[in-house]
């Protein structure tokens, strides 16, 4: 039974989705994006589906930016394809899972288990070779790349997997290459039927001759372009000849093959070497053979098949029937590979991430249909993957060296070669009847009638030409002659009048714009009336426009319309516009054409396409078409005109789209002020470097049984052991993180602070509030300036801590107004009394310095603690810093469960941090301590992390319980990913009772 498998591309993802949920496992899982779509035509053949088996659709996203749609009943054929098994696999004490995977959406496949180690935890859990992993820890792997799947599988020590027992593993087999040639004689594209070399397929009886070309050193131009080379598996062919050039004068034609030049054979020479031989020579002797064709592009078809698993776990091909003949028709092509270098045996596909340099700009889209007829006894499922089109470049032989040809996706007006290829690939218009409505006998009879009417029947009733006489100039005889050549139509004549198309051509020579417009309006009204009356009379000749003419006009205008549509619309919209226009040309119905077009062309730029679509509308439908389209076109014209004329400075402030909003947060500095920075405004170059290192670690050594392929275009399938990433990750890359839908902005913690002034008169408070409302004052850096002239200078601030001045640009520092956050409750009365007592003592100068000296004196023993960096987060929050007068040292405020600090058990809340990985944390600011600890924990190359802490002694020390209570109770810190930006803090005003600053705390990950 023949089974069909179709492979295509769905640019907007409108194809059938799989039954599983489509999950995006990593926002950075792709290695690149599509650099340009090639204009390939779609040749999709109908596939024969199995009876009573619905096809399964898989939409997969490729790292090259493609989207592959595979309609294949491969999984439904299996007896156990619908059985879902739940498998729980835990890592061994050595950190191994014990199985390898293969596949990935970049190959249009799912994630399959290809190897299971004996005695591993995966084997004990019941995982088998050939199982398809559909879900891991609640995340679907139906449409997932191999890189994202490996991150999910290695990101947790316990995996709860849902597998489908398929019993087979996908493999790959390479088939032959095919070259598409441009037949110069017949002006069409020819696809070779076999994978033989061009020298075998070319005509051996071609005329060979020797041509001598003489040039000068001043004016070196041979006047022809060459195409081909050894890297493409082709010879050197002439693809273009300059008109009137040296090559054309000596008889060189397009399609000739260059066999040798100055004694150098071109049978086995690269393109660049051929250019070097030809250029720079004043006398060139060429050996030319007339072949009448030159290569357009190449294609290489790779066929996927399935490997069956045996009892010992060794993979074997299901059936040799996959070697059966297959007919593949496609206009896609591959990267330049030689057919001799392709391996004929089967090899695995490397599923690791590719290097960015292995992708070229020629990747595009292609559609392929494949029909395979295996043996009746075997059961084989294959699908075909066709490489994207790569147009072979042309090189002009000039003194300045080769110039690469243009790609297929360039405009027709910019590339004559591309226009020629497209023109040759289009089918020829069908041979139709002449455009004349009259036969030869009828035409002679009509001439006699016109002659007799113009000479002998002067008094016959003629149609009034009063309106026409107002516009047309000339003598009366000319008008009568034109009137005599025109037949009047009456309803009782029973047939339509024959209008001569030569009449309009004769009038066009002596008409102005107004006359042409009136003529067009009269002809349109007359044809509309004829259509209405003929529809009423039921005449079979009611179809005024000839269908063959309209179809022919549509076929001639179709390439230009599609070219403009591809510049303005998406691929699906281009197909929809083409489908509606083709349906109108063959079936009619102007309303059915205009309504969907107006729905698709929903922007002023897109409405420019209506100008070209108007050319395929029948004359009888032009009035209705204009009445429906003209208002929309006028609005679009006004919109485009306003965009082009109005300068950017004069555009209104309010636009259709709302302005972008940026979340800002204050970041403290060492002088008591703060900066306003965006929440997500931190650079991500470090994260990109970490991602590249992580992707580079996914490379594995090639399989011993699989032969090495010298090219990087189609990666061979390889087994990816998931355990190979654990040591690499611990050595050089951060641990993989679970994918998330969208990164939430980090929740900032509270930074409790107080101003440093010692006097707080009521007048200054009132004056400070007025300053905050007017937003014209900024915070001063010096306490001495704040005590004098508080309202005289705009650069000085009030010592009142309650109001916070409005944002200003003084010294490049921003300040947040008081309305940004509601005030927190005041401290307890007892604490306020203590703080007041301290304030009084400090003001009197009795005891303030002693207390500060006691607090600054370090007490306690030093202790070195080592922490493992294998966990995703450190899990501590710290408080204090040099900017705090209460707690200038950095202390551990809280330890969060699940972090590295919690699992070690050696750290406790209240420990003072002295150094981390040899870098001191004494006499540093709070933000400097946060950055130092983050940087040390992210450096996975240094394992483990060494922390020097000071265990508090028996002497009483002030505890930052207030800040801890406010931080932990009022605003709990959120769990953040590893590569999140440093958590900033906000200023929070406190009552003016404590002249000192409480410690700050921040969450460290």
From Swiss-Prot:
Its main location: other. GO terms for biological process: auditory receptor cell development; auditory receptor cell stereocilium organization; detection of mechanical stimulus involved in sensory perception of sound; establishment of protein localization. Pfam families: PDZ. Residues 770-786 have a biased composition (Basic residues). Residues 86-168, 210-293 form the PDZ domain. It comes from the Eukaryota. Keywords: Cell projection, Cilium, Nucleus, Repeat. CDD domains: HN_PDZD7_like, PDZ1_PDZD7-like, PDZ2_PDZD7-like, PDZ3_PDZD7-like. In cochlear developing hair cells, essential in organizing the USH2 complex at stereocilia ankle links. Blocks inhibition of adenylate cyclase activity mediated by ADGRV1. This is PDZ domain-containing protein 7. The gene is PDZD7.
